[in-house]
Amino acid sequence: MSVRVPEFKVLPEPADLPEPLPEPAPADLRLETVLGALSDPLRLRIVQKLLLESEQFDHTCGWFGFDRPKSSLTHHFRALREAGVTRQRQYGLERRSHVRVADLDARFPGLLDLVAAWTPDGV
């Protein structure tokens, strides 16, 4: 049985971006840490939505439209960043996120294809 893998978007990095917030280096990405971050259905949905629905290079937590408190979303975005799944940058008072596609594909080929093909259940 084969899995149909949807195409996901990799948008070019704009010029003059702020420096990213602290994150693991590509060589320090650990599969168990990445899978731990992706084990939460909301975080998995965040990554999938970034992969499949992004219209810009990065997005604020409000773009996702989740009916969750901002503090809860902040926790989930931090967990994804600290695991190395997403990169966040501070733009004034807001943080914007995108998936570290090149880094994750290099370390764990096929992982993002599985995330993109995942069917959410009740998130």
Which residues are covered by each model-predicted region?
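Helix-centric, low-specificity signal for extended rod-like, repetitive segments
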Residues: E23, G36, S71-T74, Q88-R89
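N-terminal helix-turn-helix DNA-binding core of bacterial DNA-binding proteins
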Residues: E32-P69, Y91-D103
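Short, Lys/Arg-enriched C-terminal cap helix and immediately downstream tail that follows
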Residues: G84-R87, L93
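Secondary-structure transition/capping residues
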Residues: F57-D58, H75, V115
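Conserved acidic functional residues
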Residues: D40, H76, P109
